[in-house]
Amino acid sequence: MADPILYSQALAHGRRIKGSVSKVRRVLDQIRGRSYREALIMLEFMPYRSTAPITKVLRSAVANAEHNLGLDPSTLIINRATADMGSSMKRYRPRAQGRAFAIKKQTCHISIGVVTQT
């Protein structure tokens, strides 16, 4: 039986980020598996609103790798990038004749993990 692969992974989480899960996942799918520098450049030029909180969580994951594990940022790649559904904020929009329509403002939880490139 082969030896298990041991590696150090640094994680960062962003909780209750405004935005739908599907809109965040379309950005995370493009940066998963890329190097840290390449992902930052891609996020800078993408035209989506969700890139700002994703960049913040990515920088936090790299800072965790530097501080907690002593890893070099130039050798890091993104091996885990997930978005899970968070709680929904319920709001009501007044409508005609005393009615009210419910509006759900969605949030999501972003998790990013980085490892060293081998």
Curated annotation (Swiss-Prot):
GO-annotated biological processes: translation
Main location: plastid
Keywords recorded for this protein, A-Z: Organellar chromatophore, Plastid, Ribonucleoprotein, Ribosomal protein, RNA-binding, rRNA-binding
HAMAP family in the record: Ribosomal_uL22_B
Keyword RNA-binding on entry: yes
The keyword Ubl conjugation is annotated on this UniProt entry: no
Protein name: Large ribosomal subunit protein uL22c
Species in which this protein is naturally found: Paulinella chromatophora
GO cellular component term, pick one: cytosolic large ribosomal subunit
Subcellular location, record wording: Plastid, Organellar chromatophore
